[in-house]
């Protein structure tokens, strides 16, 4: 092989045999026997070969013999999600069975057809529904996307079409249908598309029962035709075909008021008379017990249509997090918030320390706001705002200490400087 410099003395203008660009339009032109190739075409060929090798090589989690067991999945969830032990066990088994079905086909050697087990998560805001789904997808190394049920409408109406969910999933895997078919879709706020009454509606309900009807086929399994990257701008392009029967759908919602529906059915009698307004810990435990007794008929009374419930055969409930669980969430998981902020402070050369009483004060604030674990970050952000603003401008800070008084707004964080005595300094 020779480069273009050896042919320049002849005065003849040389061109790439692949793309047709001249030697003046590229950085390098490599010569072979009566053929030339430019550096741009070499890079393109390398990319093509790299992609094919990547597609033909299964990741460890894609081989059936190395499919994580339910115990493996549960242990990984334990690293990131505090509490919700029963929900984690149910999810681990359902996800394992789903991917075992994908790897071995829908039909066993005995001719038994394996059904699809989509999942319904019921639990209060901030109890970990979204985190569980995200952690599962990350552990299994599969494409993951989220959708908000409140933005969905039937096709032809203003709003987001249900098939846009598959479009988002394709975007996460560079529009590769085969990869998308191994993905997980989490649909949040599913309780918000309940119909207004238990009886079938005779009027069009485009954001309630209508969306449930539109989601039926998608969740059960259909061949969805999705426009490629260009979408409607390039109508001449062929649509991508995605088999949604291979996609795992997880739906989640708070289902506020569902406990009253269950209570009426089991007739516990906790909502009548002098005890009606009493909300003690004992009463809250009773509500938790009620959720464990959930039946499909309760979801029908709540407003989900029977056909939709049938497409979500695996149902599990998450309990409301107590103060102790919130304290653990702040410090124990691998990506705990205190560890995240600690890493940010470490980049500034300072150690961030949270005293135990500070963690309890943060948890108490989150409990008062009734936002669950979701409200923890906003509390920490507000507490650390001034310190994070001033710290890059201060020199010699080796440690920042946060205690209960800082969380309650009674004092400033304690800044410890290198080679100096410990003292409290305002972040202003």
Curated annotation (Swiss-Prot):
GO MF, any single term: ATP-dependent protein folding chaperone
Sorted UniProt keywords: ATP-binding, Chaperone, Metal-binding, Nucleotide-binding, Zinc
Domain ClpX-type ZB: 4-57
GO BP terms, alphabetized: cell division; proteolysis involved in protein catabolic process
Keyword field contains Metal-binding: yes
Residues annotated for ATP binding in this entry: 124-131
Subunit record text: Component of the ClpX-ClpP complex. Forms a hexameric ring that, in the presence of ATP, binds to fourteen ClpP subunits assembled into a disk-like structure with a central cavity, resembling the structure of eukaryotic proteasomes.
Function: ATP-dependent specificity component of the Clp protease. It directs the protease to specific substrates. Can perform chaperone functions in the absence of ClpP.
Protein name: ATP-dependent Clp protease ATP-binding subunit ClpX
Originating species: Aliivibrio fischeri (strain ATCC 700601 / ES114) (Vibrio fischeri)
Lineage: Bacteria, Pseudomonadati, Pseudomonadota, Gammaproteobacteria, Vibrionales
